[in-house]
């Protein structure tokens, strides 16, 4: 049986995307995304719980993020979990689990009119060979 590695998130950017262009002018954007769940505890009190996710977008999606996304933007991200490892300057092994997005829908309302759920996806959501284990 094959495994399934699929993540779907709706949340707000915690800061403006950090966009870098790697060798070959390949864009990569990285940003924190907050998702908040609200539920009632046993006493009926509303509780909000926020989780932070690191999102990575490649190529065209990175360029869209750079152009249109900013701190507070509401987005739908679909992608895969990816855990990468590297050694820091002191030789310590570090790990990071990230959501590598391959589908992005901007859910913010436009300032000049109705909501504009602009959808963008890529079949190239994977990291680029040679770059996936670097600290970006």
Regions found by a protein language model. Give the residues of each.
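Conserved positions in beta-strands of structured domains
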Residues: 14, 20, 58, 82, ...
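OB-fold and OB-like beta-barrel modules that bind single-stranded nucleic acids
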Residues: 11-13, 33, 71-82, 101-104
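Beta-rich strand-turn-strand
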Residues: 55-94
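Short amphipathic alpha-helical segments
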Residues: 51-53
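Core FKBP-type peptidyl-prolyl cis-trans isomerase
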Residues: 9-49, 85, 95
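Acidic, gly/ser/pro-rich intrinsically disordered tails
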Residues: 1-3, 21-24, 44-45, 92, ...
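OB-fold/S1-family single-stranded nucleic acid-binding modules
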Residues: 89-106
């Amino acid at each position: 049986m094959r495994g399934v590695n699929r993540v779907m998130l709706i949340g707000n950017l915690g800061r403006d995307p950090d966009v870098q262009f790697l060798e070959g002018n390949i864009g990569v954007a990285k940003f924190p995304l907050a998702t908040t769940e609200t539920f009632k505890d046993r006493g009926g009190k509303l509780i909000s719980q926020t989780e932070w996710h690191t999102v990575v977008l490649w190529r065209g999606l990175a360029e869209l993020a750079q152009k249109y996304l900013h701190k507070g933007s509401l987005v739908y991200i679909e992608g895969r979990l990816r855990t990468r490892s590297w050694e820091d300057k002191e030789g310590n092994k570090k790990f990071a689990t990230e959501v590598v997005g391959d589908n992005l829908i901007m859910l913010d309302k436009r300032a000049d009119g109705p909501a504009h759920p602009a959808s963008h996806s890529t079949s190239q959501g994977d990291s680029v060979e040679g770059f996936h284990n670097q600290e970006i």
